[in-house]
């Protein structure tokens, strides 16, 4: 029939679905370690460490060689440099992950640029040459990919506009189709920034508009939902809202918005932390899973909310490696328990309760 796309082979569809299910396994989630060179410079600056390739390799080796990490981490998103990088002892980073049973993934977008004739609304770059890059990434050991799109809320200015939502949905769908054609599970990330003074009900309404558009576009582009994953924001109040929402409210509105818009064929929803403190990111996820069962796994794909305390424990000092790995394991365990709705709170103490919010966050 006309109007239908060419199906991917049963072999590829099976591989995609199996890998997506493995990544969304109960009690596990994703370590997002795909910071660009510029972003990791900001992280290193905060602890007084020079942003050299050697220091980046040491730090990522610290993360990926943590014994037992695979108990709670199913996948790790890498920056392109890291996919081809070796540890200080000469072991490929990909092999460190595989030794723990962790599936390597790759950030494939090329960052954001402003949509012309808009009030600073963003489009994501990187579709040019993506198919060829995906082939190379698969050969290097990657089995999933991530593409970040960004939207902002400003009711007074009508943001996000329909143009912004359409652009985000179209870009994510094209990316996802290209990935699946090249045997990579696409993680679809439409991040609605928390900047603003709006309350949680506004975020819920915008999240539903965005996700409805994204899944319509994925359908239009013949994307196999069983072989894809979603990385959305949680539904929260704006960062400047005078009346912050509780963990229970965040869980209620987030789950409601997902059930209204996300097809149950999708294996998993892997939340971004969006500048929440490490502890809030765990507690909010825990509250959602206490409300289960859900049509899909609700899990995590955290960067700052897994690494912040670990980075501070390391401080760029080689002798602190074991201590930093212990801190990482503590945070990974907390989130693994939260995925099961069994996190009791308190991991990491006061340090884990510190906000990680950055205005107009650029990854």
Swiss-Prot record:
Locate the residues binding beta-D-fructose 1,6-bisphosphate.
43, 273-275, 301, 304
Instruction: Say if the entry is tagged with keyword Zinc.
Output: no
What InterPro entries does its record include?
Aldolase_I_AS, Aldolase_TIM, FBA_I
- Activity sensitivity to pH: Optimum pH is 6.0-8.0.
GO BP terms in the entry = glycolytic process
Outline the subunit composition.
Homotetramer. Component of a complex, at least composed of ald-1, microneme protein MIC2 and ACT1. Interacts with microneme protein MIC2 (via cytoplasmic tail). Interacts with ACT1 (F-actin).
Name of the protein in its database record = Fructose-bisphosphate aldolase 1
What's the source species for this entry?
A: Toxoplasma gondii
Taxonomic lineage from the root: Eukaryota, Sar, Alveolata, Apicomplexa, Conoidasida
């Amino acid at each position: 029939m006309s109007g239908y796309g060419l199906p991917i082979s049963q072999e590829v569809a099976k591989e995609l679905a199996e890998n997506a299910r493995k990544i969304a396994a109960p009690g596990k989630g994703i370590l997002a370690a795909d910071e660009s060179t510029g972003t990791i410079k900001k992280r290193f600056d905060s602890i007084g460490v020079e942003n050299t390739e050697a220091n980046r390799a040491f730090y990522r080796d610290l993360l990926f060689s943590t014994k037992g990490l695979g108990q709670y981490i199913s996948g790790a998103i890498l920056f392109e440099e890291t996919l081809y990088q070796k540890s200080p002892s000469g072991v490929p980073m990909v092999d460190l992950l595989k030794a723990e049973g962790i599936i390597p993934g790759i950030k494939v977008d090329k960052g954001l640029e402003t949509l012309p004739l808009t009030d600073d609304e963003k489009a994501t770059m990187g579709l040019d040459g993506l198919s060829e890059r995906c082939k190379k990434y698969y050969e290097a050991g990657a089995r999933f990919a991530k593409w970040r799109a960004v939207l902002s809320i400003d009711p007074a200015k009508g943001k996000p506009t329909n143009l912004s939502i359409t652009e985000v949905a179209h870009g994510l769908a094209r990316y996802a189709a290209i990935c699946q054609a090249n045997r990579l599970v696409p993680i679809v990330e439409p991040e609605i920034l928390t900047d603003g003074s709006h309350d949680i009900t506004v975020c819920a309404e915008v999240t539903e508009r965005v996700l409805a558009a994204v899944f319509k576009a994925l359908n239009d582009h013949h994307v196999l939902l069983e072989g894809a994953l979603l990385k959305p924001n949680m539904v929260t109040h704006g960062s400047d809202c005078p009346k912050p929402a509780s963990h229970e409210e965040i869980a209620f509105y987030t789950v409601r918005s997902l059930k209204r818009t996300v097809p149950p064929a999708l294996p998993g929803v892997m939340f971004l932390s969006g500048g929440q403190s490490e502890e809030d990111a765990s507690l909010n996820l825990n509250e959602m899973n206490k409300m289960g069962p859900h049509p899909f796994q609700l899990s995590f794909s955290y960067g700052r909310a897994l690494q912040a305390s670990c980075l501070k424990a390391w401080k760029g000092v080689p002798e602190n490696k074991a201590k930093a790995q212990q801190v990482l394991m503590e945070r990974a365990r907390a989130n693994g328990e939260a995925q099961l709705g069994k996190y009791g709170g308190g991991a990491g103490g006061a340090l884990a309760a510190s906000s990680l919010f950055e205005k107009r966050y650029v990854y």
